Amino acid sequence: MMCAGMLAMPCAASVWAQPQPVASGQPDRQQEAIRQTRAFDISAQPMMQAVLAFARQAGVDLYVGDVDLSSYTSVATQGTYSLIAGLKHLLGNCPIGYRISEGNGRLSFQLVDTGPGGRSQVYSLKPVVVQGNTVNERVYQAPRAVSIVTREEMDRVPVRHAAELIQDTPGVASAVNRQNPGLSINIRGMQDFGRVNMMIDGMRQDFVQNGHMQRNGEMYVDSELLSEAVVERGVVRGVHGTGAMAGSVDFRTLDFGDVLREGRDIGLKLRGTSGMGYQGNGVNFIGSAAGAARAGENLEVMAAVSRRSIGDYRIGARGGIEGQNSVWFNGGKIEFNDVKFAAQEQDSGLFKARWKLSDDQSLLFSYVGTRVGYSYTTDADTSAQESGTPWRKMGTSKAQSNSFALDYKIKPADNPLLDLKVKAYGVETNVENYTTPTYPFSRFDGEFTDAAKIRENIDNEYWDSGACEKPDKTPYALDVCRQYGVGRNNRLSTKTQGFQLDNTSRFVFGATTLSANYGVEYFTDHTTSNQRWDHDGREVRPIGTTGKDALNPQGRRSMGSIFTELKLEDDFFTISASLRYERYRLKGKTQVPGKQTVHLSRLDKFAKEMCAYGAFPGLAPNENPRSQVQSVYGPGCRLALAGDESAIAAWWADVPTYVDQRGRTKNFYIPGGRRSSDYEKEFQPEDLDDQNALYDYDVSRSAGMLLPALSGAIRPTNWLEVYGSWGKSWRPPAINEMLMVGNHPRDGFASIYPNPNAEPETSRTWEVGANTIFQDVALDGDSLSLKAGYFDTRADNYLFSSMDVILPGSNLERLPLPGTTAFVNNRNRTKFRGLEFEGRYEAGWIYGGASYTHYLGGPNKFCEDLYFLGAGENKFDRPNADGSYPVEHQKALARGYESWRAWADDQVVCDNFVFNSAIAKPVDKGTLLVGVRLLERKLDTGVRFNYSGEGWYNRDSGGSQVWFKYTTWDWYASYQANDNVKLMASVENITNRMYVDGYSDAMARTFAPGRSVALGMEVRF
């Protein structure tokens, strides 16, 4: 054996059984240690650090006493073991034994020196090395901002929406819309377009569909198939850090150890939860079935399926803000008490097969997929819709996501330089949004308002006759055909292929370890979209449509990174330095704004004038004087739609009249006065110069960046760790930000333009924090674990959607009114600062937890280039007829610019017409949980208190308060009837509080469920 301070002697793996007597008075502790299994991933390293890792991953208390571990190196331990088998494997043939004891009802291991001269008696249970009562102990001994959501925590209250999985995590929120199953995650105020790397088993979920900019990035995940969720906030240094400015969230699926019990080759787990009748409040059924088998020593397979059925639900009846649940109806306000169109049907599947190639390496194939159907709805309106609520159902939606991966791992026990992980994966997410046919409130000429007659008229005149598919229709007829009488199916797809490779090499120098983690990551996202139309089940193609959905553009973006991190640590300190180089490339097609000359034919001008009055919606004859005008203009509009110019000329020459409400006959009113009864003279063809137009444009952009990071931690006592970090990160523009183009659906209120000049975002983040673990706080053997931190992220060129951009050639010197939209870079620094806290208390029969997030500072300010694509050609730099220049040009010269265009290109203007989540400061939030374990720990019950602060959406520009302060209470319980059966019950929102989830989708404003009661059962074999 080498002496302490030199390289430690490895303890080879061995089947040699050490004598391990159980402590007196604890005959059942050994059986409990045999039954409990854990998934371990512990490399060969100094024994002291190895047993620390064992305690953390096993979730047990471990005591060293006087045992000297400095001369030993552990055996690498990976895979699923019982607690006893795992510790035996870790210790190998070292002369170290253990005793099992119980402190305050908790399972504990105490190490014993069984070597020559060693004392085999049980030493005093001091000092404590580590106490690991749950897997979350990994949180409180990690010198960084990391949180873990365990399966136990997921099971306390049924998960209706995936956003509930991370709602208790500090620094994390979700722009949840409870009518839409898509999950969007916000970390420290940042979200969308990959700022948060959202993953399932390390596979990126990069799907994006555009809407009202509340969720530009969604994933679909089923909580029934998960074992835990790992949340890292801030700069991510390892293999999952590419392009992630805010952090990462990895939802990890069930593993073999979650289904197979120790010593069993076959395992089955069945779960089911349902709402309790009327009190279930929309929880119809949530359940799953998982089975696993071990074939010999080298092959394991597992399969699982799940189903989730959620319905509409009632909102709370107490609290809330006066009028919060009311909408306008017939000049007054009415209240609504439920959320319509929240029903969702989700089916998911999971499959894994692991082949153990040798003791050191394995190959894993995995698949996880989900399919969910739900309603395609509008955002909340201030007026009552047909449902009696703010929401209107537009149609149906279907989402399907499939993820495949192949993982290879090798970690030789005798080679500390090799700890290699390789992953190749593919993810495909498809969403279909089907919009059912709609019809106007009145016939275009105001002739009638009966809904059935309107539908019959449009179907017969435009669709059944095939008129909407003929190329010679007027512009107005084209608008009719695009909007009414036809169903539209938007199909969106994102395909992601990725490759990850990282290795960790370790060098042991006595009690100090130097590790190097290095590797590469590459992934590519390919987005496609199309539209299909149908009328009464027949596929049609309205004239003027292409089948493309430019608001969800087609393109490809690839990103790659190479990284390394060096870490030096011992029992007192940890210091690390990392460096990564990342590069991206984006290619796609879009349309950029420009100018053109537009030719208006005689028929075009006639149709424009006639139909502007004859198609005034919502009015019928004799309802008001305007309808009398419509009764004359209507025939003119119909003639324009028919396109018969000879009939138009005859009708125009007839000088139509109408009778007003007083019975007086009046001549046909023409804006500006009737000038000629000759159709050809009155409506002259015209060429309009300098008209806005869109031109096809191929985008190909690429860039790279070097990103350093530093961190350090010290542990001055056995209960305190203080850490700090600083690092740079970036995020290149996404496909939608560069390529999206089109008009707001239906009403055309806004025009959206691409920004192929968008610059990458860059940020600097620094944070400080502390971990503490106190023992014997209130009871013998209890522990109190706390993590607190401060973060400060400052981002440059943060991309946001501006609603008032100026197009090239507009000749404007200030921003227009909202309506012209594009993604632009914020020329003001965007700041995100706050405090995070979480803690746990564990005393065996009683336990608790808490978390809190407080955001500092006010809402961010947003400034943009006056011309985001450049000012372009303009009239101010053109000389007048006398050779002089306009005043604007002269002012630019006086300011030191060579032209007005140069001045305009250099201007930055500040405004807050921002249309996405960045305009809103996240709300403060917190949770407090207290639980007890009774009846020999078979009964586990507790209460959870939830708090959310208030928040505004675009407060500086007159935006309204969307999120109001609230508190709620939940109760949960589980009873382990025997080794195979566990019963579960919960009551969510006990006080039936009315509230909108804090920092949820500001446009959807879907209320959270009121009081909900659920019962469940889990059966394992």
Per-segment meaning from a language model:
Residues 110, 163, 167-204, 233:
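Extracytoplasmic beta-strand/coil segments of soluble accessory domains associated
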Residues 205-235:
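Short acidic/polar hinge/loop motifs at secondary-structure boundaries
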Residues 272, 419-435, 715, 721-727, ...:
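Membrane-embedded beta-barrel scaffold of Gram-negative outer-membrane proteins
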Residues 279-310, 314-315, 319-377, 400-404, ...:
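Transmembrane beta-barrel wall of Gram-negative outer-membrane proteins
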Residues 340-342, 346, 360-415, 429-439, ...:
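Flexible loop and strand-edge segments within Gram-negative outer membrane beta-barrel domains
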Residues 358, 513-525, 550-793, 929-931:
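Structural signature of Gram-negative outer-membrane beta-barrels, strongest in the C-terminal barrel
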Residues 569-575, 584, 778-799, 803-955, ...:
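Gram-negative outer-membrane beta-barrel transporters
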Residues 730, 794-797, 801-803, 844-846, ...:
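C-terminal beta-signal and adjacent terminal beta-strands/loops
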